[in-house]
UniProtKB/Swiss-Prot annotation:
Transmembrane segments: none annotated. It comes from the Bacteria. GO terms for molecular function: ATP binding; proton-transporting ATP synthase activity, rotational mechanism. It comes from Lactococcus lactis subsp. cremoris (strain MG1363). It is a peripheral membrane protein. This is ATP synthase epsilon chain. F-type ATPases have 2 components, CF(1) - the catalytic core - and CF(0) - the membrane proton channel. CF(1) has five subunits: alpha(3), beta(3), gamma(1), delta(1), epsilon(1). CF(0) has three main subunits: a, b and c.
Amino acid sequence: MSENVMTLQVITPAGVVYDHHANYITARTTNGEIGILPNMISTITGLEIDELKVSRPDDETHVDYIAVNGGIIEIKDSLVTIVADSAERNRDIDVSRAERAKIRAEKALEVAKAEKKSDEIKRVEVALHRALNRLNVSSHN
C-alpha cells in the first residue's frame, strides 16, 4: 500500500458499514475536529455525533460522508478503525425516517421541557442531534 493511503473501517453492532482506502479523514472527536492523514501518530479517542468526511484515493474530487452516532476511533499506522453504536453512509440514509425521528424528538423535547424532566431532556436532545446529523449527512448526496 502506498505511504499516502490508509484504510478506514467503520464497524457497528450490525456489521461493517464502511471499509475503503482513504487519503484524508475528518472526524469530530470529544476534543474537537481532527484531520487524519496516513501514518499519523497512534491514538484512541471518543467520537461525537457528527459527520465523517473521507477523501478517497481513487477520485480526488469525491468525498464519502458517513453519519456517526458517537463511538471510538483508533488510529494506528495506516489503519483507522471506528467502532460506533450506529453509522450510515449518506447514500444509505432513509431521509423520510430521519425526518420523522426529528419531528418525534422535537415533540418529545417540548413535553420534557414543559414537565421539567432534566434526564428526559438530555435523552431527547441526543435523539434530536442524531436525527439532525443523519439529515445533514444525507444532504451530501
